[in-house]
Amino acid sequence: MRASYLFTSESVSEGHPDKVCDRISDEVVDLFFREGPKAGIDPWAIRAACETLATTNKVVIAGETRGPASVTNDQIESVVRAAIKDIGYEQEGFHWDTCDIEILLHPQSADIAQGVDALQPGTNKEEGAGDQGIMFGYATNETPDLMPAPIFYAHKILRLISEARHSGKEKVLGPDSKSQVTIQYENGKPVGVREIVVSHQHLVEDMTSNQVRERVEPYVRQALPDGWITDKTIWHINPTGKFYIGGPDGDTGLTGRKIIVDTYGGAAPHGGGAFSGKDPTKVDRSAAYASRYLAKNIVAAGLADRCTLQLAYAIGVARPLSIYIDTHGTGKVSEDKLEKAVAEAMDLTPRGIRSHLDLNKPIYARTSSYGHFGRTPDADGGFSWEKTDLADALKRAV
């Protein structure tokens, strides 16, 4: 590894057009998990693959589902409008109350279902993966949440501004925003910030870039460690000069287009599959969560300072095809021992992952912005993959 280098990651807010779509797609997944038990449907049987497009005063939702008939289009529309309202869109070109919502959901393909569903108890067929693919998890001890510093702080900047906006403290700022942070590394450790970019929608049309900077700079400074911002740090706040038209009215959004923002900011490989809108039979989502969980627990256990972990699956096949670990020269034990240890410590079949991480719940809308990783586990089971409760078992296994 190079001793001195710069690395950059970006984040986007919940009002970014693609994130609006991620939120809507995950609200649909949560709706099916909430309503299923009320209708007597086993949560294990719920299926959802939901894609969303949002543009000027228009939302289109399409995909495949399996769940309670009680989930009607009217109910879905109500959930979607509530989500858009919560994000904060009440502008002429995209308003939660007046935008047109088109819903094009249909039953899951029987061909897919037969490869994924387990047979009845007592048979020998396990629940298979919902698709083929590769998934990566990553952890590093360079931040308290064991996330890479650039994406960690890019998220933190926007979350602080969002909290201020929702509280009413920053009423002139709109929902749509982006951040980007260039971190200086010395001896492989983050030590400062070279460049800061924040582009933030404003609701007063004639606001200047300097006026927007006056609003956002305190939150940037609050987000970053003391001493990281110096007189050499270069600021780019609304560098185009104006950001009044925002959200899906300014730029069409789609589900699943911010997969690097959702994960590690480019500091680790990505298998290519998006998360939002997918129930946990889709290993794009659940196995990526399991990969992060295992990598984080390896680092939390002190078995490595950095860890990249890959899982691979085939559709209809329960067991992972391969497990690969790279500790980037920081491991305290060999990678092959760690690969054996994680396989022993956790059932990595799709059903095993869903059970271990308790994923058959309405816990997904909250993941749709500010990253799926580096978050605090919730009491109701949200962000369960961020727990470090496997660390002791891994230490014993090696």
UniProtKB/Swiss-Prot annotation:
| Molecular function terms from GO | ATP binding; magnesium ion binding; methionine adenosyltransferase activity
Q: Which reaction does it catalyse?
A: L-methionine + ATP + H2O = S-adenosyl-L-methionine + phosphate + diphosphate
- Pfam families named in the record: S-AdoMet_synt_C, S-AdoMet_synt_M, S-AdoMet_synt_N
PROSITE patterns, alphabetized: ADOMET_SYNTHASE_1, ADOMET_SYNTHASE_2
Q: Where does ATP bind?
A: 16, 176-178, 242-243, 251, 257-258, 274, 278
Q: Which residues bind Mg(2+)?
A: 18
Q: Which GO terms describe its cellular component?
A: cytoplasm
Residues noted as binding L-methionine in the record, renumbered to the chain: 64, 108, 251, 282
Functional pathway? Amino-acid biosynthesis; S-adenosyl-L-methionine biosynthesis; S-adenosyl-L-methionine from L-methionine: step 1/1
Question: What keywords is this UniProt entry annotated with?
Answer: ATP-binding, Cytoplasm, Magnesium, Metal-binding, Nucleotide-binding, One-carbon metabolism, Potassium, Transferase
> What are the boundaries of the region Flexible loop?
108-118
Coiled-coil ranges per UniProt: none
**Single Gene Ontology BP annotation:** one-carbon metabolic process
Please give the HAMAP family that the UniProt record associates with this protein: S_AdoMet_synth1 (MF_00086)
Q: Assembly and interactions? A: Homotetramer; dimer of dimers.
Q: Which family does it belong to?
A: Belongs to the AdoMet synthase family.
Q: What does this protein do?
A: Catalyzes the formation of S-adenosylmethionine (AdoMet) from methionine and ATP. The overall synthetic reaction is composed of two sequential steps, AdoMet formation and the subsequent tripolyphosphate hydrolysis which occurs prior to release of AdoMet from the enzyme.
Protein name, per record: S-adenosylmethionine synthase
